[in-house]
């Protein structure tokens, strides 16, 4: 069940909720009670799926923008489109960066960037980030 909760947290933070999944991931790693590889997989997949959700919302922007509950505003759309247009597909490698990651993944959907290359680039960035966190924690526990 802890893996599912980690997936949900990682998914949620990759959408529009402004908090980090890193603290939860690090806490679970630090406890030493769970399979580290499964923690890495669940946090990574959850976070990538959250970005996929953003892409889908961007792809169907004309439907969602009319909904009162939709949290993305025109300013966020413009910011994401500007970054994505300036740096192209490579900006997706930075989809994990706070404040710019969500607008970039959303912009990729609004600009109809193909889903397979989207998933590959986002996965490289997000899995790479969590892998770096994982390796840092493992290293820290060896020396401290």
Q: Can you annotate each of these PLM segments?
A:
Residues 1-5, 31-103, 110-144:
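Membrane-interfacial helix-loop-helix
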Residues 11-28, 96-107:
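Transmembrane helix boundary and interhelical junction motifs in multipass membrane proteins
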